[in-house]
């Protein structure tokens, strides 16, 4: 099975400007992401950016596609890459964020393989068990519900499912075994990406501020499975990176 990895990378960030170029062991963060994609066995790896500073650095180790500054999401940026690079419609494209230097290569391969094995689904993504009660109630931790077919039913910043009897009797408590956190990695077939970006934004997507709800709103299916490897801690600030580097 072959697949392409597209890595959207933005320079601008209110909490961590220039994050994709931050150095880790002497290499920019984005280079580590490219290396993880290579380890996963991607046939092609493309960094998609609208910033020349990122372009100038990445050209030394990977293919770069310059994209419009007007995109509102990484998926829109990927759609432009698919169009300008003439990627065939049946190609599996994996969206790996440019600020995930320690993403396990196994997870990249897993999400691509899952989509290849689920022809009834338009997308695939991953989740991981929630072990902290605080995370259940944290709106920055997106929860996902999956049916018996391994298809996502809903994504929410709220605690879903809501275990009525227990949680009403025990406010601010939760049975963590019921909850899974969504991991922000996606696989799609290239022709579906072009379809997706032509959908009008959905009401639920705007309410929750979760773009994957657009697919569910329009009746498309998202395969979801627990990741084979634990996901790394997110890097949102320079302090996050410093703490992470202290642990490796």
Curated annotation (Swiss-Prot):
Protein EC: 2.7.7.38
Pfam family, one: CTP_transf_3
GO cellular component: cytosol
Pathway(s) served: Nucleotide-sugar biosynthesis; CMP-3-deoxy-D-manno-octulosonate biosynthesis; CMP-3-deoxy-D-manno-octulosonate from 3-deoxy-D-manno-octulosonate and CTP: step 1/1; Bacterial outer membrane biogenesis; lipopolysaccharide biosynthesis
Keyword Transcription assigned: no
Reactions listed under catalytic activity: 3-deoxy-alpha-D-manno-oct-2-ulosonate + CTP = CMP-3-deoxy-beta-D-manno-octulosonate + diphosphate
GO BP, sorted A to Z: CMP-keto-3-deoxy-D-manno-octulosonic acid biosynthetic process; lipopolysaccharide biosynthetic process
Assigned keywords, A-Z: Cytoplasm, Lipopolysaccharide biosynthesis, Nucleotidyltransferase, Transferase
Cellular localization per UniProt: Cytoplasm
GO molecular function terms listed in the Swiss-Prot or TrEMBL record: 3-deoxy-manno-octulosonate cytidylyltransferase activity
Stated role: Activates KDO (a required 8-carbon sugar) for incorporation into bacterial lipopolysaccharide in Gram-negative bacteria.
Homology family: Belongs to the KdsB family.
Protein name: 3-deoxy-manno-octulosonate cytidylyltransferase
Native species: Alteromonas mediterranea (strain DSM 17117 / CIP 110805 / LMG 28347 / Deep ecotype)
């Amino acid at each position: 099975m072959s697949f392409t990895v597209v890595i959207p990378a933005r320079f601008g960030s209110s909490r961590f400007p220039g994050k994709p170029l931050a150095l880790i062991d002497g290499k920019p963060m984005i280079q580590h992401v490219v290396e993880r994609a290579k380890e996963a066995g991607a046939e092609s790896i493309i960094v998609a950016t609208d910033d020349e500073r990122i372009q100038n650095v990445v050209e030394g180790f990977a293919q770069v596609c310059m994209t419009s500054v007007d995109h509102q999401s990484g998926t829109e940026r990927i759609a432009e890459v698919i169009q300008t690079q003439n990627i065939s419609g049946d190609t599996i494209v994996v969206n790996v964020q440019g600020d995930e230097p320690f993403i396990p290569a196994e997870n990249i391969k897993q999400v691509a393989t899952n989509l290849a094995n689920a022809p009834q689904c338009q997308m695939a993504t991953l989740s991981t068990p929630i072990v902290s009660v605080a995370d259940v109630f944290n709106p920055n931790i997106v929860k996902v519900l999956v049916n018996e077919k391994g298809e996502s039913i809903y994504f929410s910043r709220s605690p879903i499912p809501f275990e009525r009897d227990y949680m009403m009797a025990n406010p601010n408590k939760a049975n963590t075994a019921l909850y899974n956190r969504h991991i922000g990695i996606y696989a799609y077939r290239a022709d579906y990406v072009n379809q997706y970006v032509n959908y009008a934004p959905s009401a639920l997507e705007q309410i929750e501020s979760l773009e994957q709800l657009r697919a569910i709103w329009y009746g498309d299916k998202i395969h979801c499975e627990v990741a084979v490897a634990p996901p790394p801690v997110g890097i949102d600030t320079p302090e996050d990176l410093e703490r992470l580097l202290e642990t490796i």
